[in-house]
Amino acid sequence: MYKKLIVKERDKYLFHIGRSWLNTDDSTNRGDLFDIRKDWGDLPSEEDKVAFLSFIVEKPSLAHFPNEIARLSSLKALQIPVQFLPLSEEQLPKHLISLTLDNLSREEEQADKHYSWNPLVKMENLECLRILGDDNGDLLGISPEVVPNLKWIEVELFNPNTIHIIKEFKCLEAAILGEVGTVDIFAHLKHLNLKIVSAKSPKKGFDYTNISYFKGLEIARLFSIKEEIDCAMFLQFPHLKELLLHQCKKLKNVEAFLEMPVLKSLNIEDAKGISKELKASLKEHIPQCEV
């Protein structure tokens, strides 16, 4: 009746978010991801061990939201279109730890509509929030008062004001941010104990060096940094396990990665001037290395 899919790469951390930052895509922990389509029949029953639920509806609206999902006690992660908002407390599963709101596939006639979370619906168990597409500059109305224990945020900063809401989530440990432009995201979030940071689509002048505020960093992903990166700066992160530098063409002191025994994964794409000998040494010393 339903199409079972393995959890996609972008979801591999969701099941144990806040508990184990790496190696969480083991099949015994992963659960099933269901794509729910309007013409595919009934929802899973209460007895089904469904960990992930994703809705794909041709023309979604709140009227399409199935209240039955509140009975799925095993449900940990839910992905829904923003057209389902606002929801009531009775419509949401109690044990949800991850919520994805999809604002990518908006109909033209809905372009001027502003969908927003019901501020009376609190989600104290929620640890991961992902917004796909425009967050309307206010995280679709989701504030620290609504989600006080949020650990993971994933959103694109189409509106720079969004960063001022994000910095108020006191328990935040992971910030996956796109469309950062020149917003000094690391300076805004320096008071947080971030373990995972990702910055996509920066513009010239973006200050990547402020990543140094996060001494407990375990995973860092930087995309399209225009300025030269001195790789020796990563030596200040004693817990760094995974590093991705994508389309960061100007790198120096790349050999510094040989001095990082904790580093288990290094991915450098489209960088210039790294010798074959150094590439070979990096691959010999780092378990997962693509240079």
What are these regions, as identified by a protein language model?
Residues 3-11, 15:
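N-terminal basic/disordered segments at the start of proteins
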